[in-house]
């Protein structure tokens, strides 16, 4: 009887211990499940961060493509501007050559005008000499009448020549005015071309500044892509570590659940043994 009681007490103690171990296993299983859920939540958050970083990387790459497109457009604009500058230089050279020819024609016209003026002066002096002689030689008027007529004829011829010279002079002056107008027009055109050249130069400077800024932005985008790539690799590494941690925790949960099942089976066996012992005790009494 004492042996049975001791056995029952031992079995009860073992049952209590089994219950404690089962409770502890259940608590450990709950803790492991909480850790697993937390790890899964962290893994989901990391996955979201990875997705966000990938989206940022895509946007950055798209921005880089846009910047490269703009750079190509600016390079084309720069080439067009250089072509325009070359064309303007050719036009300026042609205008300079035209101006030189105009100056040569102007110099020729000026020389002809000077010669015509000298001829007109000489004719005027000859006419005055003839008139002075006719007035001074009144006593010899009869004798010199024929000479006077001839002098008048010469004077008329001189007048005709003077009129012809004056007409030619007017024509030369008109040619000179046209040459001056062309020279002024050429100078105005040169000023306009110089202004266009200055504007093109400013545009080239602006394009160079824009290109430098675009290069800086491209370098910044490259650095940003490099940083995002590093962050993506780190996030992937953390995600892999979290997945491994979840797998380890899941294995730990499975192990604790197996231990819990084993403890429950053991508890059931102890319960069966106690029931058998009670039955035997009752039968002996």
Swiss-Prot record:
Gene3D superfamilies per UniProt: 1.20.5.170, 1.20.5.340
Coiled coil, from the record: 1-277
Annotated stretches, region: Disordered: 103-133
Comp. bias (Basic and acidic residues): 122-133
Keyword entries, A-Z: Coiled coil, Repeat
Free-text note on domains in this protein's UniProt record: The molecule is in a coiled coil structure that is formed by 2 polypeptide chains. The sequence exhibits a prominent seven-residues periodicity.
Name by which UniProt lists this protein: Tropomyosin-2
Organism: Bombyx mori (Silk moth)
